[in-house]
Amino acid sequence: MPHRYLQELTTASVVAAQQRYGSRPAIQRMTANWDTDATFSDEEAAFITERDSFYLGTVGENGWPYLQHRGGPPGFLHVLDPVDGHSVLGWADLRGNRQYLSVGNLATSPRVSLLLMDYAHQRRLKIIGTAHVTDARDSGFEGLLARLSAPGPAGRVERLITVKVQGYDWNCPQHITPRFTEAELSDALAPVRDELARLRAENQALREQARQQPGRTP
């Protein structure tokens, strides 16, 4: 359930929209006893470290939002030690197309939104927080660089980005189209491959038997 997420994002205009469309009383009842802790439980931490991608939203000084996809091996997005009662995320930011839109936006507005998807199980985790960018060449951050560089990003690490979490929310599974990674499909198809191998071997044995019978042509 939301942890300080709706509290941070429910502005006066949002309240007005909820009132207009009739959801305000239900929202108030639903959020009456919600926890406002900004730290992840083991469930969120496990979900985050299992992801191989996420979407990062930033806003430029001209007011335009920007959405970027970030990907890597499972575990490239790290849950670090909490700071002042807030969970902290971190990842090694690699050299990409060198437009630096997200990095430039963060220089003037450190607030970010992250969306983490598990398409196979129709789950998504929304996170908001404040980001801090550290140049990977700066001295004094060797420990953080080593930690965020695991499990081995395929590229040149230019920056270390950490996010102090302000709130998060598990979203409902409605309208999430199931999609599967190559590894997930491989596991699911393993019995099919085994059965296919067995049938091929059985077919080959029958062909050999037929070939050995006089007057029979396989």
Where do the model's predicted regions map?
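Binding-site signature for planar aromatic cofactors or substrates
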Residues: 1-218
